Structures are given as C-alpha cells and as structure tokens.
C-alpha cells in the first residue's frame, strides 16, 4: 500500500498530545515535520513532494504554492486566519485550502482577559519586583463600569463581550455582519463605525480578520481619537496595527497599555519598536493555545485533510474551486 506523504509545520499540532495523532497512523501516512512559522524561502526549500500539508502561519505565497504542484491535493490550515496564504493563487492553481472555525473562541477570549487584567492590575511588574526582593505596591484600575469596545463581533468577539459583561463592563462593538439577537441578549451597543468604538471605550479589543484593506488600520490618527490612557488588546493579527504608532502612543501616555499576543512579523524582531515601549504585556501568539483548543483544532485540521484526500467535503474551506 502506497503511503500518503504529508508535511506538518504547526508546532502545537506536533507537540501537544491528543487524539489527532491517532488519525495519522504510520502505516498510512509518511509524515515530514518542520517547525513553523516558516518564511517563504524556507518553505520553498522543503515543499514539492507532499500530497497534503497541515500548516500554521507559514508564508504560503504564490511561488510556494506553485512549488507544491503537481502533487499537492490539499492545504489544511491549522487555525482560523488564512491571511498568510495567497488564497487567490491557491484558487487559480486549484488547491483546496481548508481551515478550522469554531474551535478556539473561548480560549482566545479567556486569554484576552488575562492580558487585560495583567495590564490594569499591573501584575507582571509587581511579580518582577517581588522576585527581586522588593515589596513595592502599585495601584491599578477596576474594570467595572468601564466600556469595552470590540472591533469584530464574531465568535471570539462575542465570547469577549460575555466576559466583559460578567465584569460589569459596558460593551459596544462594530461588525459588518451584525448579530442583532446576540447584541440584544447580552447588552452590546452597536456603533456605526470602528472609529466610534475607539472614541467611546476605555478598553479596545481587536478581533478582526487581517485583509489588505485594514492593514495598519489602527494608526496614529485613529489612536489620537481614543480616550487618553485607554487600553488596547490584540489577540487577532499584528498587522492590524501600526506598531511604531502604538509604541509612540504608549510612550506619550495616549495609550495606557497594550496587551499584545501578535506582532508583525513573527517571531518578533529585535528592532520591533514595541520592545522599547512601556506598559506592554506580550505573549508569543498563544491566545489560542490550550490543551483543549489544540486538540479540537488539530482534530479538525486532520479531518479536513483526510476528507479532501478521500474525495469528501471538508468541515470548512476558504476557497471555492
């Protein structure tokens, strides 16, 4: 029996125990592994002989996709965002691109509030001082009564809204595809534009997809419209914000803090301006990374791949062929 040769680049899929590994038995699959996220040059070096690829946030450009042919039958994205994949090129080249919606929204929402509480209650700096032998108290801020502004009220944004209401926060949001029933049930005020959300909120949380149209959307001009000292949370994509403008606003006090799970590019570069900015809490793109969500996501990514290889429809596909 000829084995199906696949490439797996996502590290959490590889490193986390779970049932997803059982879907790829050694007698059926010949598995190559790489440690992503990989830049274009590195992917070009290793692709071309695989029937299927389970990828993370690797740079699947047109050149990479062309190199994958003629053998590649499916590109299975482990995760939701497909902004690192050239979807028009994949469609033109007849490569199905699958993805994994609905598997990590609770996990990301919990992480969002972890970053927020770290900022408002100054947890990381106080922890660092105590470990240095200093017992120095700081004064933080309450969340109750403040306004949480959510940009992107999809699955993750909705979970953030529910948690904000549990903290007795007011919630406003903007989304092109408004869920009126959810908003009424959970007391979410609809704002006509994203800029209106910025002006109204003490806390702003980004949960938008990254597109060519909204790259660097949160820039100096829009930051200037925010309430002075507002907190910004980004568990979506680093490219949604102009990182230099964020750093400048933090230094000037226009932003009170930045909870940052994502940067552009990743891994973070040594000259990223955010590294020298005050009041930033970083995590290395791990908002969706819990044992529970990894298994859900990995199962769907593996099942999507197996379904397409077997001639069946996947759970979710990002392009129409």
Task: Give each language-model segment a name.
Residues 32, 39, 49-127, 141:
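Phosphate/diphosphate ligand-binding glycine-rich loop within oxidoreductases
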Residues 9, 150-151:
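Conserved N-terminal Rossmann-fold NAD(P)-binding element of oxidoreductases
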Residues 68-73, 93-95, 169, 228-230, ...:
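A short helix->loop->beta-strand "cap" motif at the edges of active sites that frequently abuts
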Residues 1-52:
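N-terminal glycine-/charge-rich "phosphate-binding" loop or analogous flexible N-terminal tail
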Residues 93-95, 101-147, 155, 159-162, ...:
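Phosphate-binding beta-alpha-beta segment of Rossmann-like dinucleotide-binding domains, i.e.
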Residues 2-3, 15, 91, 98-110, ...:
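C-terminal helix-to-coil terminal segments
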Residues 3, 72, 144-147, 220, ...:
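Phosphate-coordination loops involved in phosphoryl transfer and adenosine-cofactor binding
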Residues 61-65, 176-273:
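Rossmann-like adenosine-cofactor binding region
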């Amino acid at each position: 029996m000829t084995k199906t040769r696949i490439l797996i680049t996502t590290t959490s899929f590889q490193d986390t125990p779970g049932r997803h590994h059982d879907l790829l038995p050694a007698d059926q699959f010949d598995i190559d592994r790489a440690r992503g996220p990989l830049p274009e040059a590195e992917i070009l070096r290793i692709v071309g002989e695989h029937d299927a690829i389970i990828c993370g946030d690797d740079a699947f450009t047109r050149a990479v996709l062309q190199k994958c042919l003629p053998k590649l039958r499916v590109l299975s994205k482990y995760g939701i965002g497909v902004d690192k994949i050239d979807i028009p090129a994949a469609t033109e080249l007849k490569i199905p691109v699958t993805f994994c919606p609905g598997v990590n929204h609770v996990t990301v929402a919990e992480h969002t509030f972890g970053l927020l509480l770290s900022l408002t209650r100054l947890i990381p700096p106080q922890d660092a001082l105590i470990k240095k032998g200093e017992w120095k108290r700081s004064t933080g801020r309450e969340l109750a009564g403040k306004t949480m502004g959510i940009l992107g009220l999809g699955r993750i944004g909705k979970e953030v809204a529910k948690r904000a209401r549990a903290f007795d926060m007011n919630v406003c949001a903007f989304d092109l595809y408004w869920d009126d029933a959810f908003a009424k049930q959970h007391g979410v005020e609809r704002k006509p534009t994203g800029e209106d959300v910025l002006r109204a909120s003490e806390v702003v949380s980004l949960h938008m997809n990254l597109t060519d149209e909204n790259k660097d959307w949160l820039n100096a001009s829009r930051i200037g419209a925010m309430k002075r000292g507002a907190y910004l949370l980004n568990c979506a994509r680093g490219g949604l914000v102009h990182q230099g403008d964020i750093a400048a606003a933090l230094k000037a006090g226009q932003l009170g803090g930045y909870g940052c799970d994502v940067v552009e590019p990743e891994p973070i570069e040594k000259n990223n301006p955010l590294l020298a900015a005050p009041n930033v809490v970083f995590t290395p793109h791990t908002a969706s990374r819990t044992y529970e969500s990894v298994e859900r996501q990995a199962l769907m990514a593996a099942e999507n791949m197996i379904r397409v290889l077997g001639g069946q429809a996947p759970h979710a596909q990002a392009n129409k062929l």
